[in-house]
Amino acid sequence: MTGRLVQYGRHRQRRSYARISEVLELPNLIEIQTSSYQWFLDEGLREMFREISPIEDFSGNLSLEFIDYSLGEPKYTVEEAKERDVTYAAPLRVKVRLINKETGEVKEQDVFMGDFPLMTETGTFIINGAERVIVSQLVRSPSVYYSDKVDKNGKRGYSATVIPNRGAWLEYETDAKDVVYVRIDRTRKLPVTVLLRALGFSSDQEIIDLLGDNEYLRNTLEKDNTDSTEKALIEIYERLRPGEPPTLENAKNLLASRFFDPKRYDLASVGRYKINKKLHIKNRLFNQRLAETIIDPETKEVIAEAGAMIDRRTLNRLLPYLEKGVGLQTYRPAEGVVDGDISVQTIKIYAPNDPDGEKVINVIGNGFIAEDVKHITPADIIASISYFFNLLHGVGDTDDIDHLGNRRLRSVGELLQNQFRIGLSRMERVVRERMSIQDTNTITPQQLINIRPVIAAIKEFFGSSQLSQFMDQTNPLAELTHKRRLSALGPGGLTRERAGFEVRDVHYSHYGRMCPIETPEGPNIGLINSLSTYAKVNKFGFIETPYRRVDPETGRVTDQIDYLTADEEDNYVVAQANVPLAEDGTFLEENVVARFRGENIVVKRDRVDYMDVSPKQVVSAATACIPFLENDDSNRALMGANMQRQAVPLLEPEAPIVGTGMEYVSAKDSGAAVICKHRGIVERVEAKEIWVRRLIEVDGKEVKGDLDKYRLLKFVRSNQGTCYNQRPIVKKGDIVEKGEILADGPSMDKGELALGRNVLVAFMTWDGYNYEDAIIMSERLVKEDVYTSIHIEEYEAESRDTKLGPEEITRDIPNVGEDALKNLDERGIVRIGAEVKDGDLLVGKVTPKGMTELTAEERLLHAIFGEKAREVRDTSLRVPHGGGGIVLDVKVFNREDGDELPPGVNQLVRVYIVQKRKISEGDKMAGRHGNKGVISRILPEEDMPFLPDGTPIDIMLNPLGVPSRMNIGQVFELHLGMAAKKLGLHIASPVFDGATEEDVWNILEEAGLARDAKTVLYDGRTGEPFDNRVSVGIMYMIKLAHMVDDKLHARSTGPYSLVTQQPLGGKAQFGGQRFGEMEVWALEAYGAAYTLQEILTVKSDDVVGRVKTYEAIVKGENIPEPGVPESFKVLIKELQSLGMDVTILTSDEQEVNMENFDDDDDHAPDAIMVDVKPAEREEAGEEKDAVTKE
């Protein structure tokens, strides 16, 4: 098969090697963000107001109701919000009604409830000018879970937990003596019968009648020392509130509020759904033997005989009757916690693990509890206890906590709703208090409501929650992946330290829901995942994946798509996407490879229920961009997927010759491109904007409508300092459809994702320069700017009010020559377009110095003649080390001009410096298969090996990097790329359905290349051919964000730590290089005594010595003797602080006075130690404040 041509967007055709026709289009890839937030605005907010409304005061006289809400227009647009460092938000107004029940007076008011952050069209939020993403969280679903474990004696014990969304936990467990215990809210355990008595089943006989007679229950009753409901309630109260005097009334109220009060206990709709599903009677009846005859209550007809086995058919016959309420029993408990009847559904069966088959057990379901009952009910508790006893008798299943049917997603909407709930409940408290304090006649809703707690809760969530993250904006793919990320960490989730191996592991239920490949390396592995390409999230927060329905009558695979959750999928047999089908959609082969509950099985074709939609439904968007993924080892594929996210946008991006067909969709949905919103005709194309005149249909004719103007981003700094720039790809007069790409974003080429460049690669060694994965590169790639990228850095200077007077931004700076001021304008701010080097002035700023107290005469003179002698010091903003470049833009914000600035700031200046970074030695590069390396040598073109036609190679990679890493995909890509380049084609080779080995050999033949894809190479230095033929081809290589310019660092003097007086560490602190323990050993081994002494004293923490040494070097004198290092003094002081009498003695046993060493400090010249202000001091967590400023 030679593949067929497929169109991607307006401008690109690719030859696709896909064999499987896809029935389903890819969904919008950031739908998980946008639809969740939309739900919150439409439903979530309304739910919250309904939950707390009405608020009544303690006497029940005043009542405050929330009727409706509306969101106004945002104050700033997205662009303005970014520029002004404000939040992109809209005002939330709520219609509130206050009712005075005594007078019958009703007051209605619209109350402003704060600005609510809005989501941009691309699924992000702008908070204080920074673009942030709310990551979805994977948590345990509220439900009831049963688990078993074998103890040290080999006895199987069971435990169960009822987990609510919020509220007290209820746990059951067995011990070695077969007694069943319950724990309420993590307290000490009680026999489970105590809880049943508290619910109103006071005597032993009632409990036995309810649950059925069995030895576990008998053991528990023996252990139980209460014999009535009152005693049970008191017992529970003493456990939950130790030390308080128990009364019956208090005990009842406590239990009622813990479990049966909707405000204190919430299962959420998902918890109710899961509990009803788990405790329903039907799952436990399947494959069991009935111990009673089941009769239709209306017709008295026998549906199932006692002793009959319940198979699938009998169960299906029973189901309608079970739903009607066969076996429903209503208990009227005496004086329990709850008033009213308890209805449960009971059916008797024979215990399957009884050797005689005579023992009868009760199977109890929780009756029929409506979906909107969000708290737990007594029926739930009884049914969950019954399930526990059933498990002991071999009926029912334990749960796998890592199964995706038991884990759910909290997306943006729900996370926000939870925060909003916290804010509202705090506000509710305030409202109640104000109701009782203020005068009831004159009060208005506005006076009652304090919106501060609501605003604070929302602000706190967006500003400091673990799940609200600064968007990774290195390139469009990084952006897209960040929005589709699923994290198991965060509040209410796991912690890195506690998470075991099982949670992190790939589970069979991840198939089509979560990517098994894309996850970070390191401590977060498996805790942070990525959503698969086709996955969707249902209303309960479970991830669903699409399957094609197989028609059971005809055996044909239909085009009907069903989205299944993980626990629904467990009931079906699912065939792989690559199963061969006939023309009419039936399976060609009698036996089909399929999956059932994590087992890969071969089944007869009539047993298949569903079929995969596409081979790439298993993996995430980033993984689906790796061609020949099927030929790579998964560990390397993981690195490949992660490194694509670190690709720096290049000056001239180029789409991969060998792609997967995902490039177009990923780029389009990422939010980096400009997408057309309505069908229309392009009227005008400029670098900065595109005008599209809408075409609308009126009476069957197309007429011109409104004009849409699309603004393009030009050289904007992204969150990561890369350059975001958009370029139009449409022409004037083009007719564009809705959803078409009008302009490429960064790392895009003709609407496709283009993270790197296609270069000519040879797998060969060259003088050992590609040892350990190093890369040798041709100088052509430097000269022709193939791997040149643009980086923009932002620097800020602000003038504040200080105690001694305001700071001033000015050109007039003390002790600075005219030469240093040449690039500053009259305001003292650098001009746009100036070329600046490290240490140059960007913004001139002076701060008033502290002055001595003036005498009365001096003060009088000052008042008359004005302040002449004001002492100021230079606090200008300078270019930090490695930050030189060209000034791209300057933004000035003034308080006088009405700009919103933080308190105490009068003026804020932002300077943007742009750098053009060519590729250089030390930069990190990678392919898409996890084949990464650092450039070790850039050779002149003439020294590079060349092909027989004289073309020099661009890059040489080490062939030893392939076999042990098992990422053979790169070799396929190399050969296929070579052939495609020759034929002038672009190729799409989708994951798991791409070009085969045979296809690659065929296209090589078609391109007229050698069948083994190797070629003779000639040495550029000598012109001689190399001994063996070499694999040469086109590979897609990307430049990663780890650039040598950001890592190179040197220091002579700089800041020192306060306590030890040693230099700080790290580039961000402008620190020194650590000469560690092992390095000291090395010098000791060489006997290099003077070097060693110097390193341990004057170069490190001998305070006096280092000043004197600096002086000596400057004056050209001999370097003096070192003194005592500060760390030694610290050690002595620490020993003395432990109460030890430690003194230092000289060689002739004279005591050395430590104080003498400090005397010299006073004479140390001030100006010697240079204080360097690091640009990113905030990022340095280590010793942030511990800097001595000399």
Swiss-Prot record:
It is an enzyme of class 2 (transferase). One of its GO terms (molecular function) is ribonucleoside binding. InterPro entries: DNA-dir_RNA_pol_bsu_ext_1_sf, DNA-dir_RNA_pol_bsu_external_1, DNA-dir_RNA_pol_su2, DNA-dir_RNAP_su2_dom, DNA-dir_RNAP_su2_hyb_sf, RNA_pol_bsu_bac, RNA_pol_bsu_CS, RNA_pol_bsu_protrusion. Its EC number is 2.7.7.6. Residues 1155-1190 are annotated as: Disordered. PANTHER family: DNA-DIRECTED RNA POLYMERASE I SUBUNIT 2 (PTHR20856). HAMAP family: RNApol_bact_RpoB. Belongs to the RNA polymerase beta chain family. This is DNA-directed RNA polymerase subunit beta. It comes from Geobacillus kaustophilus (strain HTA426).
